[in-house]
Amino acid sequence: MPSQQKKIIFCMAGVFSFACALGVVTALGTPLWIKATVLCKTGALLVNASGQELDKFMGEMQYGLFHGEGVRQCGLGARPFRFSFFPDLLKAIPVSIHVNIILFSMILVVLTMVGTAFFMYNAFGKPFESLHGPLGLYLVSFISGSCGCLVMILFASEVKIHRLSEKIANFKEGTYAYKTQNENYTTSFWVVFICFFVHFLNGLLIRLAGFQFPFTKSKETETTNVASDLMY
C-alpha cells in the first residue's frame, strides 16, 4: 500500500482512539450508565394495586459509577433523592466489582491515549518492527478492547446479578421495600461499547494498512524456517 494511504489510515485510527478516550473520560463522570424503574412493593401490596394504579408506586432512577439521582413513589407523592457510591453506598454494593469497573475504565482511557500516540507516530514517523510499530499497535488495540469488554461485563454483572438498582432503591428505607421493574443501559454504557468496537475496527485498519496479524506472521516465519531446515 502506498505510504500516503497508510498515513491516512493511521491518522483515522488515531482520531478514532482520541475520540474514544474523550468519550470514556466524559462517561466516567456522568450518571448516565443505566436508567431503572422501581416498584414500591410494600405500598402496592397494602392497597392491592393493579393496572394503572401501580403508576402511583413506580419510581425511577439513573446512575453512573460515582453518583446518581432518582424519585421514590409509594402512593404518597414523589420523593426525590440523590446518592453517591463513595462513601454513602459502600456497605450496600459489591465494592470489589465496582472498584474494578472504575479501574479498568481508567486503564482503558490511558491505553487509548497511548494508542493514539502510537498511531500518530506510525503515520508521521518512521516506525520499525518494535513496540511502537505494528506490533505495538496490535498490542495496545487488543488490550484496550479487552479492558472495554471487561468494563461492560463487570458493570452488567453488578447491575443484573447483584441487583444494584434494588440495593440503591432500598438503601436507608426501613419501612418500604422496592423491587426493580425495568432497567435500560443508557448513553455512557454505550459509549464504552462504541469504544470497544472502535478498538476492534482499529485492528482491521492496521491490517488494511498492510501489516499482518502477529500470529499470522509467526506462522509464516515458522513455515519458512521448517522449509529451510528440510533443504539443508
Curated annotation (Swiss-Prot):
Keyword field: Cell membrane, Glycoprotein, Hearing, Membrane, Sensory transduction, Transmembrane, Transmembrane helix, Vision
Species of the source: Rattus norvegicus (Rat)
Subcellular location: Cell membrane
Main function: May have a role in the excitatory ribbon synapse junctions between hair cells and cochlear ganglion cells and presumably also in analogous synapses within the retina.
InterPro entries linked: Clarin
Tree of life domain: Eukaryota
Major localisation: membrane
Name of this chain's protein: Clarin-1
Similarity comment: family membership: Belongs to the clarin family.
Sites carrying sugar chains: 48, 184
Membrane-spanning ranges: 8-28, 101-121, 135-155, 186-206
